[in-house]
Design a protein with these regions (language model features):
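A glycine-rich helix N-cap at a beta->alpha junction
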Residues: 64-78
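Active-site metal-binding motif and surrounding structural segment of the metallo-beta-lactamase
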Residues: 1-48, 76-78
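Phosphate- and divalent-cation-binding pockets in alpha/beta enzyme and binding domains
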Residues: 2, 28, 56-57, 176
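Conserved beta-strand segments of alpha/beta enzyme cores
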Residues: 46, 71-73, 92
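Metal-dependent phosphodiesterase/nuclease catalytic metal-binding core
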Residues: 78-226
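A conserved acidic, glycine/proline-rich C-terminal tail/linker
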Residues: 226, 230-232
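Short active-site segment of divalent metal-dependent hydrolases/proteases
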Residues: 23-24, 173, 231
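Short internal beta-strands
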Residues: 45-52, 223-225
């Protein structure tokens, strides 16, 4: 449903990241994998999840996914280590150990820096051929037919700053967590309880909204997104 609401095509999904093996975070996985198969997926899909899930994942795939036309691979994650577990041409995904009732980690998604934007008006003004665009985006100056050197900074505008998203799923308050998520563009931090239930949050390894705000403030994040509210 969220894919369709966001107008994101299912074919854009290349990897799935699961923080821990509580039902509200993983029960929908097999249904999603089945849906992808029925929609005609053929490209490989990787699932990153706590390593203890690997035997069950293989059993579920063998039992439920026999007719699927695409490959599903689980990548076991060590939830006790902070490390980069995924990287492609545009982003990295890093784990952050959390404290919950069973092995659990958060994820930080970081965009890689991109090249600057070409100033189309200046390209047209100086008559620069299309074949030179990539060189200019990579920092080259342009020398015109009269030998005049046009500096690169006249031909480009700065690239958009890389964005980052930290997903800190179920966890008790970790005082130094802010150091792990420092400066991210958007921080999602669970906030199961209100501050008057801080003792309860500690018992059940969850956080309060105030504690989430403390992490965000100390980390200097751009925005804080709260979630995982208790029905109480």
């Amino acid at each position: 449903m969220q894919f369709r609401r966001s107008h994101i095509h299912f074919s854009k999904l290349n990897a799935i990241f699961i923080s821990h093996m509580h039902g509200d975070h993983c029960f929908g996985l097999m249904g999603l994998l089945s849906t992808l198969g029925m929609l005609g997926r053929t490209s490989k899909l990787r699932v990153y999840a706590p390593k203890d899930y690997e035997p069950l994942f293989k059993q579920q795939v063998e039992y439920f996914m026999q007719t699927m036309e695409y490959e599903m691979e689980m990548i076991p994650v060590d939830t006790e280590k902070q490390q980069i577990i995924y990287e492609d041409h545009s982003l990295t995904v890093e784990t952050v150990p959390l404290k919950h009732r069973l092995p659990c980690c958060g994820f930080i998604f970081r965009e890689k820096p991109t090249l600057p934007h070409i100033r189309r008006d200046m390209i047209d003004y100086y008559g620069i051929p299309i074949s030179q665009i990539n060189n200019i985006k990579n920092g080259a100056d342009w020398t015109n037919g009269e030998g005049e050197v046009i500096p690169n900074e006249k031909l480009v505008t700065p690239a958009d700053p890389p964005r980052s998203y930290a997903y800190m799923s179920d966890t008790r308050y970790i005082p130094n967590l802010w150091e792990k998520v420092k400066g991210v563009t958007l921080l999602y931090h669970e906030s199961t309880y209100t501050s008057d239930q801080e003792d309860r949050a500690k018992i059940y390894n969850h956080s309060t909204a105030r504690q989430a705000a403390m992490v965000a403030r100390n980390a200097g994040v751009g925005k804080l997104l709260l979630g995982h509210y208790s029905a109480r």
